[in-house]
Regions:
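Single transmembrane alpha-helix segments in multi-pass membrane proteins
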Residues: 4-54, 82-93, 231-234
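Alpha-helical transmembrane segments within multi-pass membrane transporters and channels
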Residues: 58-102, 108, 155, 242-247, ...
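Hydrophobic alpha-helical transmembrane segments of polytopic membrane proteins
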Residues: 24, 72, 224-248, 269-275
Length: 289
């Protein structure tokens, strides 16, 4: 029983990171219809921004959360305004453009701070462990899990309970009709892209103390994030949360009997088999029709 509890808790840690990354990806696609191939690079930018703020400016992790979000959200906003805005409804062009943006961001990091690995330590006040279901669990991992849940709830409230969310849903349902009622679809798209990239950056900031920081670190997470979004239903927020849990827990248990590489491969196979049965994903409620 202790083994299963331990692996379940480990799976929740994976779930937390996947949820934040995939949530941003799902929001961007669900609203704009853009498959953002550079999404992993925003995870990387978040990690490097956290490293810079903590090691160069002396800011703590908690204090750096808002600056990390704002800096990366501003980048996402500008990219949408300057590049993505001119490519809507051109699927292959947006895929190629966002892939190119990702490559450029990686090279900019290599040129500015180098390719060597960077490391961050877990804040001392979160480095201790606490007892949970009879297991010793890192306070930092518990914090990440609670923060991910808070971000998901915040995103849901914004989309379904605010005036901006009403405009967002109107634009995704029928852009032309929404424009007739005075909704600025361009502003909605820009804000959505900024919010989605900002969330991805926060995931990178939180994963930085757990893993090494490198220019290509985002590649390791974007594949899993795409699996989460597709499995849950490409345009379903609830599906994104549920599939994050499913993939996180499945990866944890498989890795305990083998290794991370085999676990990722088997999870991919399982995802493909599920999609053969339910091509639209496990959940069908949509942001975008």
């Amino acid at each position: 029983m202790d083994f299963f509890i331990s692996q379940f808790i480990s799976g929740l840690s994976i779930t937390s990171i996947l949820l934040m990354i995939a949530l941003g990806l799902a929001i961007i696609y669900g609203t704009t219809g853009v498959i953002n191939m550079a999404h992993g690079e925003f995870v990387m930018i978040g990690a490097y921004t956290s490293w810079f703020l903590q090691t160069k400016l002396g800011m703590g992790l908690i204090a750096s959360i808002i600056p990390i979000f704002l800096i990366t959200a501003a980048m996402g906003f500008l990219i949408e305004r300057l590049i993505i805005r001119h490519l809507y409804n051109r699927l292959l062009d947006t895929i190629l453009a966002t892939w190119g943006i990702g490559v450029i961001l990686q090279q900019l990091i290599r040129l500015s701070v180098g390719s060597e690995l960077k490391y961050l330590e877990i804040p001392s006040y979160m480095a201790e462990s606490m007892s949970l279901f009879g297991q010793q669990v890192s306070i930092y991992r518990v914090f990440i899990f609670l923060f991910a849940i808070a971000i998901f709830i915040l995103a849901w409230l914004i989309i379904f309970k605010t005036k901006f969310g009403m405009k967002l849903r109107a634009v995704t349902q029928n852009k032309d009709m929404a424009s007739c009622f005075g909704v600025n679809s361009g502003a909605v798209y820009s804000a959505t892209f900024a919010f989605g990239t900002g969330i991805a950056a926060l995931a990178g900031a939180f994963v930085a103390p757990l893993k090494s920081i490198s220019p290509d670190m985002g590649t390791n997470y974007i594949i899993d994030a795409f699996m989460v979004v597709v499995l849950g239903g490409v345009e379903s927020l609830i599906g994104t949360a549920a599939s994050s849990f499913i993939i996180g827990e499945t990866s944890s248990f498989i890795a305990s009997f083998s290794n991370d590489t085999l676990a990722k491969a088997l999870v991919l196979v399982i995802t493909i088999l599920i999609l053969r049965i339910k091509p639209q994903g496990l959940f069908t409620r949509k942001i975008r029709s």
